């Protein structure tokens, strides 16, 4: 048991060092600024011009979208770029498990997603009448969403060996999630077929958690479903990323 605990500590510290390295190298690279920081704002402004929306709908949608693009943006750059340059091969050759490496990459995306979520939350709270009724639940929702979206980013970029290959599908998937996941349009107003699709997307559950926290209208059953769904998506995306990398590395 003691040996297991020590091994776990070493693996976690190694993953943190990998995340720190990614943060120093990739956080403020051009594509991350464009797709992580600016892209959510551009999409939101393009969709909201000429429309009126309740501020309680703006805050969760904007923050969830920034987390989706931010947490995944860094992995769409870091992993394919390192594979193209051969630095990822050296990392794999080190005495580190692939699971630990992916965990570190996921942490890197998590940190960037949290950073952008906080930035957009502050911006959204400057709107007239903006407030968050349950800050603790909102913070929990941000963290859980960033974990899920970071794991998604690693999963999407895992099969690709270069940035130009990884960016188009990653961007397409995220944009589809934004328009189908309740960021701009309430799920209840969608056709039944699109509602079914929406419930297969992690962003739907992220938006719902943040909306409940924003309004303070918390309903236990949907909240538990949201949390369970995001945890399930995180595990699936993480496991898929490890499996895809193992397959492509061999």
Predicted regions and their residues:
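Residues that define the loop-to-transmembrane-helix transition and helix capping
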Residues: 30-31, 56, 99, 164, ...
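Transmembrane helix-loop junction
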Residues: 48-49, 65, 81, 94, ...
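Hydrophobic alpha-helical transmembrane segments of multi-pass membrane transport proteins
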Residues: 56-127, 172, 178
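Alpha-helical transmembrane segments and their short interhelical loops
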Residues: 98-99, 103-171, 175, 220-231, ...
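Short, membrane-exposed interhelical loops at transmembrane-helix boundaries
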Residues: 204-218
């Amino acid at each position: 048991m003691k040996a297991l605990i020590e091994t776990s500590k070493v693996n976690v510290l190694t993953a943190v060092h990998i995340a720190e390295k990614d943060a120093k190298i990739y956080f403020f690279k051009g594509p991350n600024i464009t797709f992580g920081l600016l892209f959510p704002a551009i999409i939101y402004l393009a969709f909201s011009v000429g429309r009126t929306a309740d501020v309680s709908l703006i805050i969760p949608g904007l923050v969830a979208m920034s987390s989706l693009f931010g947490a995944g943006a860094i992995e769409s750059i870091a992993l394919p770029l390192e594979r193209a340059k051969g630095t990822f091969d050296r990392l794999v050759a080190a005495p580190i498990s692939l699971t630990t490496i992916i965990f570190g990459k996921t942490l890197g995306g998590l940190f960037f997603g949290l950073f952008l979520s906080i930035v957009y939350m502050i911006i959204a709270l400057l709107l007239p009448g903006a407030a968050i009724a349950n800050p603790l639940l909102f913070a929990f929702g941000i963290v859980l969403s960033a974990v899920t979206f970071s794991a998604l980013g690693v999963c999407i970029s895992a099969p690709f060996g270069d940035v130009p290959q990884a960016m188009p599908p990653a961007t397409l998937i995220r944009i589809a999630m934004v328009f189908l996941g309740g960021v701009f349009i309430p799920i209840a107003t969608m056709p039944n077929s699109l509602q079914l699709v929406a419930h297969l997307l992690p962003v739907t559950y992220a938006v719902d958690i943040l909306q409940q926290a924003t309004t303070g209208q918390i309903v236990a059953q949907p909240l538990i479903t949201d949390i369970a769904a995001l945890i399930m998506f995180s595990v699936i995306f993480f496991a898929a990323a490890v499996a895809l990398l193992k397959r492509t590395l061999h």
